[in-house]
């Protein structure tokens, strides 16, 4: 009898130890994964003493992202000037003209003075879906109605066709298919409204180039991660199309030259919906500011980080995380498009 009791006690002890081990492993996994907010941050969340010296050196070499909370023509001018960049030739200013009737596109009164001072041309491409911007005639009317033609020339880059710029070493796509008029410009200001997006999670500098500079067939090509150039922009592999966006932007950077392109994001009217939506949801989050950089990855990462820190961010965070939006930045950094580590500089300090 004693022998039987001993065996039973031994089995109980073994089961207890096994359960304890499982809980420890579970805890280890939870700790390693971190919170969504931690994963969103471009810089390291935790740092050991041994890493501090290396981290300090990395941060010292990190690209600058310039910031102002002043969302006004003078604030926009100030962050632009902080870039210490001047176009050397004909300047294209890439914006989204916005889908009618009520999208949150950047207003003429905000961006007009800067664009005029630079003698820039507002450039866009037609869309690859229905709506008011799928044909040149309709799109030109939208540009006029939304005030873009009141302060600058307006160029639909795909109006006379398209051209291809190669992607070097792409996993998803091997070319960018852009409007043919893109060849007419030597310098580029990518002026983006940062906001949520139903398919990408968020839209900023990377999306404004990857989709905005693409011709309609180029848009389908990126959305389908290189599988087709006609048909629907709907896709089945979310990460693949996010990766295709990053690869498309490398083609643009390589073709025009990194020194010929800069990026500005305006963080106002932060709806969960893109400016391609004519009936966007009202924002729950307050306006944040204007940011500028020569690095599109650092710029979009800084904007995401500010969203994670902001009050009223629940709906926008849900949209970003539902679509795995941060993977765009992870992959873009991996392929050398830019850095998720950056130095944020307030131009008003």
Where are these predicted regions, by residue range?
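Post-signal-peptide N-terminal segment of Sec-exported extracytoplasmic proteins
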Residues: 42-58, 86
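Positively charged n-region of N-terminal signal peptides that target proteins for export
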Residues: 1-9, 21-22, 303
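Short, low-complexity, disordered segments immediately C-terminal to signal peptides
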Residues: 21-46
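Extended, low-polarity segments enriched in aliphatic/aromatic residues
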Residues: 57-113, 117-349
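C-terminal motif of bacterial Sec signal peptides marking the signal peptidase cleavage site
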Residues: 15-19
